[in-house]
């Protein structure tokens, strides 16, 4: 990397090159430690390690943690596997926290972005398709992993500067599927669409009180995930996921700017069975809808999140 960054130079001052160093695979914290130490031990701190980003690579495998030959079906899975998949998706929070803590030792001002270069569910390819093309279906399980992960990224946006779901169309946890001249939107597409209002906005501090969980044993994880932002016009966006297959969740959103009055201008959601997915024959099984299960309160808004 030192050789690379030496010869890749900023020739256009108004178009700076962002240099991203190859970072850890999943939980290889020693790699992060050695990379940061190597660069900062021989570099003026103002140059933040001669890098603008450090990559992080993590996929969610539904059935096995390390056997890439048995990843599990994209559409045919049990409730136990559903929660196991969500718990493995939730591991992204720990990865960001622990790699971020190491980066903080050397880069407390967070000049170096953590670049999550590949993330998402990686399941078995669809039967009858070319294994090399990595074509898989996309269900409400994918949507919840996407929503949970994007909320995690949002809440760590001071360190996570870029993240790339793998991949956009027809490969792994994609947002679109095509067949010739046909194209359908996946449940993951709608998650990205609903969360678009966070783009360009400022993150607001938020937290959940109550501690409800879903799953059990090693697959237990928080029931609700959230993130909140405010745009330049003062519009606040709140995104929430309910990871439960069984029960809805009442959430009383309290906004703390004293004296301000808030009302809901738009509310959208998706829901469906855990294996609900769109096909070319039925392209709108999972679709974005108007959300009406809310009421304005003196301090914000109260919502009832449906189960998956």
Predicted feature locations:
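Short loop/turn motifs at secondary-structure junctions
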Residues: 15-16, 49-50, 159, 263, ...
């Amino acid at each position: 990397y030192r050789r690379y960054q030496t010869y890749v130079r900023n020739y256009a001052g108004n178009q700076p090159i962002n240099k991203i160093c190859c970072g850890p695979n999943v939980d290889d914290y020693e790699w992060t430690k050695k990379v940061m130490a190597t660069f900062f031990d021989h570099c003026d701190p103002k140059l933040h390690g001669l890098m603008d980003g450090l990559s992080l690579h993590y996929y969610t495998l539904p059935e096995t943690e390390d056997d890439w030959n048995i990843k599990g079906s994209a559409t045919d899975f049990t409730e136990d596997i559903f929660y196991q998949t969500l718990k493995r998706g939730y591991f992204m929070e720990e990865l960001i926290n622990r790699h971020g803590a190491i980066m903080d030792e050397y880069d407390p001002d967070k000049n170096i972005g953590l670049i999550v270069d590949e993330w998402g569910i990686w399941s078995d390819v669809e039967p009858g398709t070319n294994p090399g093309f990595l074509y898989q279906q996309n269900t409400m399980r994918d949507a919840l992993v996407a929503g949970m992960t994007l909320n995690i990224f949002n809440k760590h946006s001071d360190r996570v500067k870029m993240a790339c779901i793998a991949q956009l169309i027809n490969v792994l946890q994609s947002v679109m599927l095509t067949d010739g001249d046909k194209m359908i939107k996946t449940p993951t597409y709608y998650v990205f669409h609903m969360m678009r209002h966070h783009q360009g906005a400022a993150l607001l501090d938020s937290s959940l009180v109550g501690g409800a969980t879903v799953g059990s044993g090693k697959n237990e994880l928080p029931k609700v995930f959230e993130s909140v932002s405010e745009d330049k016009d003062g519009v606040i966006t709140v995104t929430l996921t309910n990871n439960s297959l069984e029960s809805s969740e009442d959430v009383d959103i309290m906004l703390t700017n004293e004296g301000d009055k808030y009302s809901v201008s738009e509310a959208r959601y998706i829901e469906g069975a855990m294996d609900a997915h769109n096909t070319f024959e039925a392209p709108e099984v999972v679709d974005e809808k108007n959300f009406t299960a809310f009421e304005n309160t003196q301090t914000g808004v109260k919502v009832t999140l449906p189960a998956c």
